[in-house]
């Protein structure tokens, strides 16, 4: 049911696709069991149809996760689903190191990512030398990343890479990425192994946008990432603390878009929250129901920020939640108006 290195992300997408069907069935007074049956029927028709399409493949896993999505939507309701989804998403961002031995790497040539064109002059981990081979500390090496920790390096900057290029990284003996400090275009990029990665979801990275913007190839600069009460990234005199993944970026657990610009990703952040909160407004009954649903959804967002590694959303993400709630309610009213509109036909006598 879960296959491949990002099998859970694919399963999550299939589940999410049918959650609105569960909302719809539940709004007609049916329970989760009925939603499950409807989900099975609809997904079964789709999978059966794909048997006759060239290049398409029907799968049992799609049937299971689609129908599960309908069940979850009916069981939790729109507001409950948003709250649970954000809490689960935040929990998946917990750092999750392995117990295997760790290897340090200076601008490694990994094949899956371009090699950084600059040069690493020196590097340290927790003020101790950080070599480009097996870390000399006594195992388990995961203790090296217990807070507080700092990975830092002095480098000769290279040209801006078109995709994420590691400058300093830590991999374990099983070739699993534990930590990466690198560059992408003019951004300083940091990412680490999280519970999401361990469970085969995608995992968003964290950046200093334009960190290399005023740095030319050949300049000597220092870069670092440190963890304690909050995550801090630094490039020369530019430091950002409290950085991390916001609720709006939680879509990256299912399908993270690394290549596009940050402005594009922020647009996706906005639309993702609008899409999450819109069903709350659409399926709420009256102002009281709308207020309760909004409270549950926004409460779930606040709880995720308080008790998980998610960081506080910006104003744009708060506006996106409110827009979703309002747009959902407006769409419901439009549907009601269309349904009640006279057809113009008169009854014959």
Q: Where is each model-derived feature located?
A:
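Bulky hydrophobic segments
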Residues: 1-61, 67-349
């Amino acid at each position: 049911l879960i296959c491949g290195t990002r099998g859970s992300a694919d399963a999550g997408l299939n589940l999410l696709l049918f959650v609105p069907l569960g909302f719809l069935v539940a709004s007609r007074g049916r329970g989760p069991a009925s939603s499950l049956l409807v989900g099975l029927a609809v997904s079964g028709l789709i999978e059966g149809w794909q048997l006759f399409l060239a290049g398409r493949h029907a799968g049992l896993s799609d049937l299971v996760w689609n129908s599960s999505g309908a069940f979850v939507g009916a069981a939790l309701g729109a507001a409950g689903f948003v709250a649970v989804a954000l809490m689960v998403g935040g929990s998946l961002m917990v750092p999750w190191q392995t117990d295997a031995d760790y290897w340090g790497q200076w601008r490694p040539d990994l094949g899956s990512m371009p090699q950084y064109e600059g040069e690493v002059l020196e590097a340290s981990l927790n003020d101790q030398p950080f070599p480009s081979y097996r870390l000399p500390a006594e195992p388990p090496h995961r203790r090296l990343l217990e807070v507080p920790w700092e990975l830092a390096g002095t480098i000769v900057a290279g040209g801006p890479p078109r995709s994420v290029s590691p400058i300093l990284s830590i991999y374990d003996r099983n070739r699993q990425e534990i930590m990466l400090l690198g560059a992408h275009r003019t951004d300083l990029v940091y990412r680490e192994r999280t519970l999401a990665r361990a469970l085969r979801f995608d995992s968003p990275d964290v950046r200093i946008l334009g960190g290399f913007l005023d740095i030319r190839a050949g300049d000597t600069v220092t870069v670092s990432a440190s963890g304690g009460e909050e995550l801090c990234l630094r490039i020369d005199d530019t430091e950002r603390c409290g950085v991390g993944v916001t609720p709006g970026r939680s879509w990256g657990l299912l399908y993270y878009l690394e290549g596009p610009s940050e402005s594009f990703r922020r647009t996706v952040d906005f639309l993702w929250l609008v899409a999450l909160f819109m069903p709350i407004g659409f399926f709420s009954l009256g102002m009281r129901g709308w207020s309760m649903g909004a409270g549950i959804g926004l409460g779930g967002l606040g709880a995720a920020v308080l008790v998980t590694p998610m960081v506080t959303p910006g104003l744009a993400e708060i506006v996106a939640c409110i827009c979703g709630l309002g747009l959902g309610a407006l769409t419901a009213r439009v549907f009601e108006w269309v349904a009640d509109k006279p057809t113009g036909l008169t009854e014959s006598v």
